[in-house]
Structure formats: C-alpha cells, structure tokens
Amino acid sequence: MMSFVQSGTWFLLTLLHPTLILAQQSNVDELGCSHLGQSYESRDVWKPEPCQICVCDSGSVLCDDIICDEEPLDCPNPEIPFGECCAICPQPSTPAPVLPDGHGPQGPKGDPGPPGIPGRNGDPGLPGQPGLPGPPGSPGICESCPTGGQNYSPQFDSYDVKSGVGGMGGYPGPAGPPGPPGPPGSSGHPGSPGSPGYQGPPGEPGQAGPAGPPGPPGALGPAGPAGKDGESGRPGRPGERGLPGPPGIKGPAGMPGFPGMKGHRGFDGRNGEKGETGAPGLKGENGLPGDNGAPGPMGPRGAPGERGRPGLPGAAGARGNDGARGSDGQPGPPGPPGTAGFPGSPGAKGEVGPAGSPGSNGSPGQRGEPGPQGHAGAQGPPGPPGNNGSPGGKGEMGPAGIPGAPGLIGARGPPGPAGTNGIPGTRGPSGEPGKNGAKGEPGARGERGEAGSPGIPGPKGEDGKDGSPGEPGANGLPGAAGERGPSGFRGPAGPNGIPGEKGPPGERGGPGPAGPRGVAGEPGRDGTPGGPGIRGMPGSPGGPGNDGKPGPPGSQGESGRPGPPGPSGPRGQPGVMGFPGPKGNDGAPGKNGERGGPGGPGLPGPAGKNGETGPQGPPGPTGPAGDKGDSGPPGPQGLQGIPGTGGPPGENGKPGEPGPKGEVGAPGAPGGKGDSGAPGERGPPGTAGIPGARGGAGPPGPEGGKGPAGPPGPPGASGSPGLQGMPGERGGPGSPGPKGEKGEPGGAGADGVPGKDGPRGPAGPIGPPGPAGQPGDKGEGGSPGLPGIAGPRGGPGERGEHGPPGPAGFPGAPGQNGEPGAKGERGAPGEKGEGGPPGPAGPTGSSGPAGPPGPQGVKGERGSPGGPGTAGFPGGRGLPGPPGNNGNPGPPGPSGAPGKDGPPGPAGNSGSPGNPGIAGPKGDAGQPGEKGPPGAQGPPGSPGPLGIAGLTGARGLAGPPGMPGPRGSPGPQGIKGESGKPGASGHNGERGPPGPQGLPGQPGTAGEPGRDGNPGSDGQPGRDGSPGGKGDRGENGSPGAPGAPGHPGPPGPVGPSGKSGDRGETGPAGPSGAPGPAGARGAPGPQGPRGDKGETGERGSNGIKGHRGFPGNPGPPGSPGAAGHQGAIGSPGPAGPRGPVGPHGPPGKDGTSGHPGPIGPPGPRGNRGERGSEGSPGHPGQPGPPGPPGAPGPCCGGGAAAIAGVGGEKSGGFSPYYGDDPMDFKINTEEIMSSLKSVNGQIESLISPDGSRKNPARNCRDLKFCHPELKSGEYWVDPNQGCKMDAIKVFCNMETGETCINASPMTVPRKHWWTDSGAEKKHVWFGESMNGGFQFSYGPPDLPEDVVDVQLAFLRLLSSRASQNITYHCKNSIAYMDQASGNVKKSLKLMGSNEGEFKAEGNSKFTYTVLEDGCTKHTGEWSKTVFEYQTRKAMRLPIIDIAPYDIGGPDQEFGVDIGPVCFL
C-alpha cells in the first residue's frame, strides 16, 4: 500500500506492497514545476533516483520515497533490477509452445504507444458489492531495499514519465478492441521465442473495426490475468442446455455471500487443464465477447469435486415427461388444515366409539320462567384471577407531550450506502510537509481512469526475467454460449452427496391417494362454545380484495411444521455453477449398477435433433479418474457469502510508545455497563472531613450529663433537698405486661394528610340493569380505570330487552375491603337452574396473584345491554337545530359510537343477590408479577423464641442523636466512683430556701487561733483543695429518685435473625376505616377460563398512546436503495471512541476559508405524519336566534335521560329526546365534597411530592423544602420530570439537601491490573487502557444507562455544587505523596464526566484534596488513600476514570472504592 499525502488529501494511489512517504515539496508556478534544475509539466511523473518518485501537480512537486516490504521473498536469489528500488524473484523462462494447428507462437509485445492525455474525472459510480478477494500480486521491483518487492501504482500511468534510464516492464495496458481478422496464413515453422520487449505505456484505443468472419477455432491459450471487475451486465437470455461436464477444480474460497435461494441443481462442468499462469496484469476493461468457438472434444470424467455453495435459482425449465409411477412413500407429516369442503353425503353408520370427555357448555337454553326469590347465597370462594383483556384499540392521538430530553447517541448503525460525491471545494494552499505517517491500511481500489494520450515511445529496455507464476485470476464474466456439442457418453454415477438444504416449496401437487387410517387421537380439549345458529351453506367465494397496506413486521414466528412434500417440479434450466462449498461428509456409498456389455464403436452419424430427455438409466460402473481437463471459462462472480465467523482473538500487541497528550476530545459515547464488582473489604473509618456547611437548627438534643462538682464553697445555710442523682445504668427490659383491655373508641380525629394507597376496595354490588339511555355528551377522556377483580364465571344469560333509561347515580365512596374467602374446590358443572332473581352480592375475594398476560380470548357473544353509564357533567347548551318536519317517532336507531368515559358514577343501589356462579377451573399459575406496593401493616405476631446471641459485630458509626426516650425504670444503685477532681469554682448561686435540719456533724479539728479582727464580709471562695484519698466503700444507700435518661448508647451489634414466630391468631376485625383512595392497579391475574364468544362489538374509541418503547436492536441491513439526490453536507457526527494518540505532527499553515458550497436540492417529501391530537374545544359561539318550535315530543321524556340526550355525538336530525324540562335529580353534596377532597389530595401530591415511587421529587433539595420532617435515607427522584417510569432511587442527605447517586459497581476489585512494558513509567487510565478495565457508571444497574445519563444531565442543571470521594487501595503503589522523594510526581489523575482531569497540583480549580494518605511507600501491605473533589461546576462530576502512575510491577496491586457523587 502506498499513498501520496498532501495537506488536503489530494488523491490516493494504491500499490501492492510498498508505502510512499512524503519527503519534500516545492512550488513554482501554477502550470509547470522545477525540480533539481529540471522543468516538468503539470501531472508529469519522474524518478530522480531508484527509490524516489515525484509528481508535478499544478506547480507543486510531490516526492515520495518507495519503501520496500520487509517480508522476505519466497525465492533463493532475489534480484534488484537496474533502475528499480526493491528486490524481486527472478522468473524462469519457458520455451514457446509449438501449437498443433501450424500457427506460430504469439509474438512479443509491440513497442509502447505514446502516453495518452489525462482523462477527466468520471462521474462517481454507485457503490458496488464487495468483490472477491483478489489473488496476491507478484512482487514488484525495488533497488537498495532489504527485502520485498514493489511496483509503483498503475495510476501513475497517466503521467508523463521523464527519466534518464528506461523503466522495466510495466503492467500490460488494457486490451484494445479486436481488429478485423486477416486471412489465415500458411503454416510457418515454429519460431524461437523472442525476448520480451520493453513494456510501453498503454496505447490509445483504436477505432473498433468491423467484425470479420469468424476465424478457425484457436487452441486453448494460457489463462490470462484476471480482468478488472466490470459493471454488472443485464442478464442474458438463457442459453441452450449444455451437456453435463465433469466437475471443475476447486477454486479459491470467495468472500462468503448472503445465502441465495436454493436453485435447481446444475449440470457438472468439465475439468479444464490448469494453464500456466501469466504475470498478473492490471484488471483490463471487459472486452467484447468473442465469437463462439467450435466445441472441443469431451475430456474424460474428472474426480468428483467438492460440493459447491448453493447457486442462484435458475429459471424453470420446460416440463419433463411424466415418469413411471413410484412406489407409495411413507405417509408425510400432517398438512395444514384445508379450506372447509362442502358437506359430504352421510356415511355408513360407524361402530360405537369410546366415551368422549365431557363436552363444553352448550349454548344457552330458552329463557326460563322467573323462579321464586332465593336466599342470599353464602360467600363464594374467590374466583381464579382472570386473563388480561385483549389490548384495546389504538386511542385517538393525545395532545402533544412536552418534548423529551435529548436522547443519548444510539448504537452505531450499519454503514449506509456511499453517497454521491460532493462538489469539490476550492483548492487550499499546499501545507508544509508533515512527518512520516504510519503505514496505512490498504485503500480501496480506485476506478479506472480513461486512457491517456499516447506518450513518446521509450527506449527499448533489456530483456526482463520472467516473473513467477501468479495466482489464478478471479473468474471472468461468462462467455456467450457455444454451439451445442455432440452428446457425451453417460458418466458413471457419482457417490451420493450430502442432503441439500431445504428447497423452496414446489407448486401445489394434485391430491394424493388416500393414506392409511391414522391412529385414534386423544380426546381434544374443550372447544369454545360455538355461536348459535346452524351452519349455512358456504357462500360463493368473494373477489380478491385490494392489497392492504403492509403491516408492521411481526415478531419472529415459531418454525412451522414441515408441509407435505410436493410433487417434483419441472426440471429447471441449469443454474450457474456455485462457488465450491466446504467439503461435505461422505454420503452413503451408492449401489453398484449392473455392468453393461461393451458395444462396438459405430460410425458417427449425422447429428440428430435433440430428443426428449429419457428416463434415468441404471448407474454404470465407476470409471477410472480422467486426466485433468482444460480450464473452463471463468464463471460469473457469485453472490457475496455469509460473513465468516470471527477468528480467534489475537495476542495482545505490544504497548505503543506514549504519545504526547492530545487535546481533550468530545465526550465519548457512554461505555457499556460493567459487571458488578465484588464488594470490597470494609475500610477503616476515614479521617474527619472538612467542616460542612452550617446546618439548620437540629432537633433538641438529649439532656446533657451533669457537670463535675465545683470546689467546696463556704458553708451555706441548710439547703433544700439535693439535685436528682446521676442516671444509673439502664435496666434490662421488663417482662411484657398483660394485654390491656380494649379502650373506648375515640372521637373522630381531624382529617389527616392523604395516606399511602390502601388495598383496592371491593367493587360495589351490581345494580339491576337500567334501560339504555341516549348517548350522553362526549365527556373529556378520563384516565383509564383500574381493572376490576375477576368474578366467578356465570352461566350465559338470555339477552334482555332494552329497558327505559334509569337515572344516573353519583360516584359512591369506595367500599370496605372484604375478608378473603377460602378457596373452594372445583365442583362438577351442574345443570342450569331456572334463573332466580339476583341475590345480594357476596363479599369480594382477595385479588389473586399477578399472572402473565393471557392470550387474547375469543370474542364473546354480544352481551346484554349494560347498566346506565354515569352521567357526564352537563354540557354547554347547544345551538338550536333547524326545524324538523313533523314525523312519527321512528323505531330506536342503532346504538351510536360509544362516548368517552365520563367521570366515575356513584354506586348504584344494591341489586338483589344473584345465584352464586360455579367456580371456574383453576387457572395456570402466572409468572410472578412486579413487586406490588407495600401492603398495609398486618397484625403483630406473637413474640418468637429468643434467638441465639450473634457474634459481636464491628462497631457501627455513631448515629445522629435520637429524640429523648421515655423515662426508664430506676436502675440499681451504682458502685461509688472515684472522687473527681474539684472543678473550677462556680458562680455563687442564689440563696436557697432553708433546708431541713441536718444531722449534727462530727467535731472538726481545732483551727489555728486567728487574730481578732473586725468581722469581715464574706471572703472569696478558697483555692482548690488537694484531692482527698479514696474513701472506703459506703453501704448501699436507699434507691435514689429515678435518674434522667442517659445518652443513647451506641447501637448494639445486630443479632442473628430470629426463628420465624408462630403465626398469630387472627385479631378481631378492626372498625371500618375511612374510605381510602383508590389502590394502585393490581398486577394481571392468571388466565381465566375462556369466555363464550360474544357478538361483534361496535368499534371502540382509540386508546391512549402508549409510552415510548426503548430502542430496539438494530435491524438487519436493508437492501441498498437507489442513490438519492445529493444532500447538503451533514452536521458532524458524534465523536467516536477515543483512539490511540498519534505522533505529534508539526502545525500546518492556516488554510484560507473555502467558498461556501451550493445549497443541495430539496430532499424527497417525507412520509405523512401520524394523525395530530384532537384540538381543544373552541370558544362557545354567540347564541343563535331561537329556532321555531319543534314538533311535540313523545310522552314521558325529560329527567336525566333528556339531559343525556342533548348534544349526543353525531345525532342525525331531530331527536325526540330534546326538551326543556327542568333537571330532575338531586345533588349529593357529600359525595361531591368527597370527590373534591380526593382530587385535592392528588393535586397536593403533585405539587408537594413525597419522594415515593409514585410521587418522585425533582431532587432532594426540593424534598427537604416540601417535607422538612423527613429523615436522611433513600428516596425516588425524577430530575427530568418526565414519565415516572424513569425515576431513580438516590440517597438524600436531609441535613444538607444533597442528592447522592451511587456508582454501579461501587468497587474496582483489588488485584494486579497492569504489567509494565519496560518503557518509562506514565499515567495509565484504568477504563481506557487496562485489560478488563471500565469507566465508572452511576445509578441503579437495572435501569438502561442512557436513562441514568439523562437524569444525571438534568440533575447537574438543577445543582450549583457537586462533590465526590474516591478511595484508592494500594499495595506497593504510591497514590499521592512519595515519602522517599517528598513530592507528588507519582500522584493519581482523576477524569471527570466532561473528560477534564483532576490532579494533585496545578490550577486550583482542577486539583483534588486528600483526606487520608496511607499509600506513601512500598510496604507489601494493603493501605489506602482517600481523595475528594468539590466544585461549583456540577458538569465536571461524577468521576468516570482513574489513572495511577506507580503501577506495572509484578508486586504492585490496587483497587478502588467509588464513592457516591452528591449534587446540591
């Protein structure tokens, strides 16, 4: 590979081995160049010396060194030809062959023609399919190179070569068009082979001569070099069917193609004799197809070739004659069910079959007479949970949501097809030469330019040595079909091949003969009950409908059962020969055929017309292996193969030299989430951090201990009783007291704040069916209701008649929770009793466990009309309609489209109890549902047995001071402590009241006689006395008064889990609680029994739009589309992953700004968008003029039904239910107030979220403001305030309001991570450079990383400060201060989320602080250093990578604890 490099990447030249490296560059004028005293024109190419090549490009000289390949040549004596740079292998010469038809051998090449003028750039082609890998080129020629060979690029051929010495043989030019063939000459003597002439530059193509008469067939020449891939031609007409040839030799393995459809099996081709390989030439342009040659003699049969890859499907051949009927095959697998046939005539009566399993429920019988009023049934067992309903229809488009936060960069898509070339920009000035670049990967081969004008013929060079034989060229395009050859002898049968892949299904065969009677199957499961009515005769088939729009791609279906084998299709045309596939397993050997008697050779008769293909004869004996046949013509290029499996991973390369620090790149795409690391050992307590911000006023602390005693004062008057004594040790827990009696019920308390969601209340009893009302005004779309608990399955009732509309009730308060019923066993289905009047509703059973979504049930029969819907709020008065003609009231019209759900109606009156339904069969156990919300607190269990005392745990950190506890019972008298040192003198207290008379003291020792003085005032207290000796232990005093509660002790060690206590007895039912708010939606129950088929319901309204799904996996690459119009230049794509740092190049000159390119043509029109959301209702219009009086309505209108009828949706024309009677319903203020209260509570939770999963806060600071009473702990936050489903769980420090997010994982395991390559030490990034390393990620591991990244981005925007700690565990590794040198040169670097680096010294904004430094020397023991970084730029955190310096030795290990990142 060799490339010219220029500042603006001018062009790329592709060679086979060598690499050109930019050496020098000089400028003259715009047209010509001057170099070393010689003048050259633009686009001239010359070699000043053998290993240098130069080109003149519009006044600029580009010279490059030719670097020879370092790989040794595979020949004993490589040679460097004169005037060349690199060594090549000498080629043996071969004598010219004497051809059998008397023609002389091919003469030497003619003199090279003059070079052509440079062609203009061709239009960019469409991107081609990847070609087959080409054969390796022959080594080039090079002088003064150590080993390896090279030739410079053939694309230099368009430049004028000026050199003092004639060049060696170049590559052959493109083939000219065939000239007119001359008359055949007389056979000459075979001439001796001439020496090859100098290879000239390619000549200018001559004009195409008229086609001459076909010459005699020439002998098969040696295989020419592989031609250049031409553009795909149009498919030719299928040629006549050729004779089966012997198998060809195995070709080189091509690039695996996409698997084609299996074609019809082609005929074997003949083996060609491998010709001598000529020197590899350039790929020539496709020549015109030659005339058909005469058919050659058929070669002997070759050895069977390896199985080829499946070829393209050939065109279907003409249908062959019907073969003789074969013996009956094995019965095929059962086919798919056919369409229903017409009813057959009744068969003969069969024998009595075995008793079948019980059938499914029959269709409902005639409606029975109403039975007598039944008693209320006992509470039924809870029915099994029902299936999830089938998904609702698509809802109408909701209003457009708030634009979401920008998503993260998606996974990189597969490369699109190459776009068309953009308009070239203006040429910039040449840059200064850069340093040598590293050897690049081979570039794609450029398109062939047009032939240049002929150059001046060069002097004839010396004879070159023959090159080594090249690899076989790629297959050429198939030649035109030759004339049909005579029929060959039938070859012996080959061994059976391995079974082929399953072919495409054949055409549908005629009905086969009836198979034998199958074994009786097991009784099937109960079918779903059929709809009523007898089956009608099948209607005549309808015409085909219009093609529907293509639906969305379905999910991958399960593999279908194999269909019955179809009859053999007609024999297709032979397909093109596929590439040889991998060798298959040996098939079973075929049976030897009978040996035929030898026939005498007959005279060749005239060729008869092609007879029809006869039936296949018996296989003949295996013949001897034939000689290798001539090479067949190269076949067409096959389809690209399936991509091969990845090779084994290579060994790790040597570490590169450290490059200079590159500029900070754009943030890379987030790395994949690493596995959770093993939890690290618990570190010792860290040192005290820097003082935090001043907190708010804390809660009142516990009562302080009593201070030390002051020095003895002067004797006072008798004091009052002394202060309370010091608290004694805390007494042990008392035994539990007897259970107190039940207290009187207290008065109702004031309304509390809304509680957490309680369990779902039972559904109210179903009211009696009301008459169907007119459609009400279309209400605002309510939120989807909660699914009701599946009741037991009732028998299908008769369809009731439409009753008159009942009045609408208001929403009832949710009922109390019913006690869960015991689960009954499944009873045998009883006969259907006569319908009694409905009994009272039994209590609702507890909801079943959540099941997986059941399959969609069969549609049930049309149900009887439901009860009246709840009345919507009265709509605005509509405009008066136009006057209608007086008509008789028509029959009731069909039901209108269902209106949107109104607000929940009140509970109806209790209906009379229905008969308890038969318990349905138990459904399959569902998958465990999602974890539900915490249940209500159960009754306390009886105390479990005392557990064994656990081992003492490590002492925990002291918790915050608790609230003062209740006063403890008096402890026993403590042992008298030693006397304390006298305290400093206290202030004189106020004089106390006189105390009771004390006991007389013992007489003191006599003092020294003082001088008589005047009575003085009280003196200052004396100095501290010396401490007295320890007194004897006094007797136990009487118990003191209860002491003040002591400070809370440190938390005791956690005891082991106690054994599970016995289940407590069920407590008495508590008083009914106040109705709780509606519970959260229960998880779907397991699948219920399949319902009866209902009549087709009317089309429902569209459901609400679902949440946006997570991005799916990338689909398979589509087929390339047609080239689009040239689009405008796109915006720069996202930065790729950070590459290795390249060598530091010299700065180039500043280029001038180019002219702005033209604006591209407008893109194609986009697809039609989805239907927009329904607009908000417009402002009410002005009232219209009053209409004329309507016709008199029918009797008995008005009431709630009249209101419901007003403004009915799309009511056509006059409605008899319009009226102006006053509204006749009572407003239940209590229910309205309770509804308002519930709505108020929900709004309150939106305004002041409590940090639960249901009501996440924006961040912990908001939570602290709204709820100052909350303690520090884990809460849910949703910084982007979008859907609650992406809320994240964080730790809230309620002292400061910080929001802290843990890393995931939180530790890097302690181990040997890096081995030094011996170069000088440097910082090594853990996530970027170390094997198994990873960049740190944050947030819950079960959330997608891009969701956490979005939340972090919003959290940064909401914060003004951020901080984070990192603990580095070291073993023989310096983390910060090097104790030996006393400096911080070996300190770690940390990388923030914006790829900024934090260091030990430098700019104070980017330096970290060290809280504890235990990694200052190599001790062979584990220690740790704790780093902290605080910033007012929240964008810099969290820390995503760490780069130690002092690592790489065999005994150097480290690990990391990643502390949580906290935002404030």
Curated annotation (Swiss-Prot):
Propeptide: 24-154, 1220-1464
Keyword Ion transport: no
The protein, known as: Collagen alpha-1(III) chain
Stretches assigned to the VWFC domain: 31-90
Basic and acidic residues compositional bias, start-end: 228-240, 265-276, 822-834
Gene name of this polypeptide: Col3a1
InterPro entries: Collagen, Collagen_superfamily, Fib_collagen_C, VWF_dom
GO cellular component, one term: collagen-containing extracellular matrix
Subunit structure: Trimers of identical alpha 1(III) chains. The chains are linked to each other by interchain disulfide bonds. Trimers are also cross-linked via hydroxylysines. Interacts with ADGRG1.
